[in-house]
Amino acid sequence: MPTVNQLIRKPRTAPVKRNKVPALQANPQKRGVCTRVYTTTPKKPNSALRKVAKVRLTNGFEVIGYIPGEGHNLQEHSVVMIRGGRVKDLPGVRYHIIRGVLDTQGVKNRKQRRSKYGAKRPK
């Protein structure tokens, strides 16, 4: 416990908050164009081919976005919407591509958690 004199000499400093999604620039989502769509492998101990896309945003940032769900229709020059949210086992992937918005189609035959994957209600 510091004394009053110690606090006068060197006041308490608040910890510096680091922005986890700098490319969004305090916006909830950003639009961008896919420059490369590819698969990558996760860190140990996981094993898969995760679908990701490199996206050039409208503000000039170039980020890597994860494509959630089974199957996708994205290719180079597809216009996509990006939201924050990292993928824990993919280093450098700090954004998610939103399904069912702009050029990204929703997941086919999705029955549960449809809103997360842009799927319409089945008849």
UniProtKB/Swiss-Prot annotation:
Coiled-coil ranges per UniProt: none
Modified residues (3-methylthioaspartic acid): 89
Pfam families according to UniProt: Ribosom_S12_S23
Membrane spanning stretches: none
GO cellular component assignments: small ribosomal subunit
Keywords assigned by UniProt, alphabetized: Methylation, Ribonucleoprotein, Ribosomal protein, RNA-binding, rRNA-binding, tRNA-binding
GO biological process entries: translation
Recorded superkingdom: Bacteria
Function of the molecule: With S4 and S5 plays an important role in translational accuracy.
Alphabetized HAMAP family for the sequence: Ribosomal_uS12_B
Protein known as: Small ribosomal subunit protein uS12
